[in-house]
C-alpha cells in the first residue's frame, strides 16, 4: 500500500464521517484514526500572500519516519514502526505548507518551552493560497517543533510535540 492509497483512504474517511479505520491485508496491518473533537476544526484565515513572499515553496516533502503518523505493522515478523517519543502531538489538519510565524521576519508563534492553551495559534498551514491558522487544541508546554518553516506537510503530519497539562 503506497502513500497515495493511504491518502485516498483518509479522504474517504472524512467524506463518510468515519472516525477509525483498520485493515489487515497481505502481511500489512494499517490503522487510521481521525481527531474529531469539536475544538480541532479549523476555520480558514485569509492573509495577504505578499507577507510570505520570502518563504521558499519548492522544498521536497520530508520523509523522516520519526515524523510519520501512520502506524504500520508487518504480520510476518510482528515488528512495529512507530514513534515512541513521550508527549502528545499537534498534527496538521490539512495538506499544505507550514509557516511557524505570521511573516518571514516575524518571531515564531510558539517555540520550545512556551505554554499554550487550546486556543493558542501555533502555526499557519497554507493551502491553495489560503492561510489557515492551526490552534493547539490542548493545553501544555511546547517540547519540540518538528517542522521547518516552508516545509510541505501532509494531513496528519506531526508539527509539535507537547507535554499536556495534567488537568
Swiss-Prot record:
Pathway, per record: Lipid metabolism; fatty acid biosynthesis
Under Gene Ontology molecular function, one entry of this record is: acetyl-CoA carboxylase activity
Q: Which GO terms describe its biological process?
A: fatty acid biosynthetic process
Q: Which SUPFAM superfamilies match?
A: Single hybrid motif (SSF51230)
Low complexity bias: start-end ranges = 75-86
Key words of the record: Biotin, Fatty acid biosynthesis, Fatty acid metabolism, Lipid biosynthesis, Lipid metabolism
Positions where N6-biotinyllysine occurs in the chain: 129
Q: Where is this region: Disordered?
A: 53-91
Which residues are in the Biotinyl-binding domain?
87-163
Q: Where is the composition biased (Basic and acidic residues)?
A: 64-74
NCBIfam families in the cross-refs: BCCP (TIGR00531)
Q: Do you know which PANTHER family this protein is assigned to? A: OXALOACETATE DECARBOXYLASE ALPHA CHAIN
Q: What function is annotated for this protein?
A: This protein is a component of the acetyl coenzyme A carboxylase complex; first, biotin carboxylase catalyzes the carboxylation of the carrier protein and then the transcarboxylase transfers the carboxyl group to form malonyl-CoA.
Self-association and partners: Homodimer.
What is the recorded name of this protein? Biotin carboxyl carrier protein of acetyl-CoA carboxylase
Q: Which organism is it from?
A: Chlamydia pneumoniae
Name of the coding gene: accB
Amino acid at each position: 500500500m503506497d502513500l497515495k492509497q493511504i491518502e485516498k483512504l483518509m479522504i474517504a474517511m472524512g467524506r463518510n464521517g468515519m472516525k477509525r479505520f483498520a485493515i489487515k491485508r497481505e502481511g500489512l496491518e494499517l490503522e487510521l484514526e481521525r481527531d474529531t473533537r469539536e475544538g480541532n476544526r479549523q476555520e480558514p484565515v485569509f492573509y495577504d500572500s505578499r507577507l510570505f513572499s520570502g518563504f521558499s515553496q519548492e522544498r521536497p516533502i520530508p520523509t523522516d519516519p520519526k515524523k510519520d503518523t501512520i502506524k504500520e505493522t508487518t504480520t510476518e515478523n510482528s515488528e512495529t514502526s512507530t514513534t515512541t517519543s513521550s508527549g502528545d502531538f499537534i498534527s496538521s489538519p490539512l495538506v499544505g505548507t507550514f509557516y511557524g510565524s505570521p511573516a518571514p521576519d516575524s518571531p515564531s508563534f510558539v517555540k520550545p518551552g512556551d505554554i499554550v492553551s487550546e486556543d493558542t495559534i501555533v502555526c499557519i498551514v497554507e493551502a491553495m493560497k489560503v492561510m489557515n491558522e492551526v490552534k493547539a487544541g490542548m493545553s501544555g508546554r511546547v517540547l519540540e517543533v518538528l517542522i521547518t518553516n516552508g516545509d510541505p506537510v501532509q494531513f496528519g503530519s506531526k508539527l509539535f510535540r507537547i507535554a499536556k497539562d495534567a488537568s
